[in-house]
């Protein structure tokens, strides 16, 4: 009898949580000094979070969509840590809740093109923070629209020149160091 109850409990828990998601850890923005104003950063974060939510729904929360979501949410939250869409999506995904499809201003082709254009502008501004965000945007753009030749070319040139983008520092902020008194 107790084995049956345990089975029912496990089955009920599985129904509530339809997928596992490892949320990005963002303690503070690494893009504070990036060459964008706060309104732009918030708009990019919102559109990225909406696109990500819609992709998760479209792809039924498969591993590819959840992997993309981890990177996209990390970028969105670094751009605008209090962005409503990004915070809500992160919460829902952590709980295993399928997000709602949302109306978006940008389809995949347009969003990827926007990211490539912004990345080119950020590269021209120079500085490590601008270049890091540019690399992130190119990486996301090539995932969003792998047929975008400008995104693919920029992505491949980045790999040749700099190697693969290390997402760890972006998706997994280190624990804060607490000094000894």
What are these regions (language model features)?
Residues 14-60:
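N-terminal leader/linker segments that initiate helical-solenoid repeat arrays
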Residues 1-16:
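Bacterial Sec-dependent N-terminal signal peptides
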Residues 45-46, 92-117, 157-181:
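Alpha-helical linker/edge segments of TPR/alpha-solenoid repeat scaffolds
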Residues 41-75, 114-129:
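Alpha-helical segment of the N-proximal tetratricopeptide repeat
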């Amino acid at each position: 009898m107790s084995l049956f109850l345990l089975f029912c409990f496990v089955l009920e828990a599985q129904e509530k949580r339809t997928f596992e998601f490892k949320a990005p850890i963002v303690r503070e923005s690494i893009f504070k000094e990036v060459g964008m104003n706060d309104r732009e950063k918030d708009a990019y974060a919102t559109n990225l979070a909406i696109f990500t939510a819609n992709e998760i729904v479209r792809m039924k929360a498969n591993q590819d969509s959840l992997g993309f979501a981890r990177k996209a949410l990390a970028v969105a939250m670094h751009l605008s840590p209090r962005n409503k869409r990004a915070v809500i999506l992160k919460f829902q995904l952590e709980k295993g809740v399928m997000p709602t499809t949302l109306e978006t201003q940008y389809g995949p082709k347009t969003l990827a093109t926007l990211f490539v254009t912004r990345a080119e502008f950020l590269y021209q501004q120079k500085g490590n923070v601008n270049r890091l965000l540019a690399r992130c945007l190119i990486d996301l753009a090539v995932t969003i629209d792998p047929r975008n030749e400008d995104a693919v070319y920029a992505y491949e040139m980045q790999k040749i020149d700099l190697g693969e983008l290390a997402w760890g520092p972006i998706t997994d902020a280190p624990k804060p160091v607490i000094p000894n008194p």
